[in-house]
């Protein structure tokens, strides 16, 4: 049974599936849809054209789909949407902005945990099973791949890609792409410290797959020489598995931009 508190303000166009619960003083704008089993606590604000999937938990005072923080965006400008998948936990005071382009969306996948005060900027992509600790701040146009874990107050520059199953220690200020499966720590810029073994275990990789990643890391980061040249040399070897190839691909792609952010190639300003 769908339950809506009488103090909630909900546009008549909003679509609520069976079992949705809307708490006191929520404001939900036009064009929003919310999937079954999703619980929306008190004082949550959901902006226009936000699509929310099943079994999510939205804690009090989070704001989803509010106007992007762009100086060049005129007062009457049209902006895009926000799509949130299933089984996400979005804690208090989280803010997630929609795309700045009317035909595009900011996208959040499934099974993610965004802790208190996390900010996700416009045009970002978060995949699945991501954990962001308190006050992580993600600038616009970033890509966060599956299984990434960002500790408290990590900051990402615009257009940064964080590869799958990476871990970033608290207070890291990340201004360039990070290949998959790695640990980074340090303030600005952080440094690669090793392989995220705990992440590999959570990913369900076999012992052989984990060993392949560890061996690739040694060849890429611990045997001297330039990282890009090491990656190109490793790419010449036969029989590399898909995980090692993903590491190599990320390194080569990020080298295509002078600051190490592959997605900068696609910016339209």
Identify the meaning behind each predicted range.
Residues 3-190:
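Structural signal for interior beta-strand "rungs" in well-ordered beta-sheet cores
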């Amino acid at each position: 049974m769908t339950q809506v508190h009488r103090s909630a303000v909900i546009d008549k166009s909003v679509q609520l599936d069976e079992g949705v619960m809307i708490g006191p003083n929520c404001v939900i704008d036009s064009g929003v849809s919310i999937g079954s089993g999703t619980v929306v606590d008190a004082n949550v604000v959901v902006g226009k054209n936000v699509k929310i999937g099943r079994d999510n938990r939205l804690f009090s005072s989070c704001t989803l789909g509010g106007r992007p923080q762009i100086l060049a965006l005129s007062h009457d400008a049209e902006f895009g949407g926000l799509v949130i998948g299933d089984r996400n936990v979005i804690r208090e005071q989280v803010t997630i902005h929609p795309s700045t382009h009317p035909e595009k969306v900011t996208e959040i996948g499934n099974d993610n945990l965004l802790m208190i005060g996390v900010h996700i900027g416009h045009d970002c992509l978060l995949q699945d099973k991501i954990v962001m600790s308190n006050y992580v701040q993600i600038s616009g146009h970033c890509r966060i791949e599956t299984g990434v874990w960002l500790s408290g107050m990590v900051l990402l520059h615009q257009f940064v890609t964080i590869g799958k199953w990476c871990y970033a220690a608290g207070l890291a200020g990340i201004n360039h792409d990070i290949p998959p499966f790695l640990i980074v720590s340090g303030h600005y810029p952080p440094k690669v410290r090793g392989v995220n073994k705990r992440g590999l275990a959570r990913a369900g990789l076999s012992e052989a797959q984990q060993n392949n990643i560890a061996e690739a890391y040694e060849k890429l980061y611990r045997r001297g020489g330039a990282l890009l040249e090491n990656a190109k040399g490793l790419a010449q070897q036969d029989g590399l598995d898909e995980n090692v190839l993903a590491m190599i691909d990320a390194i080569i792609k990020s080298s295509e931009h002078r600051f190490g952010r592959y997605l900068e190639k696609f910016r339209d300003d």
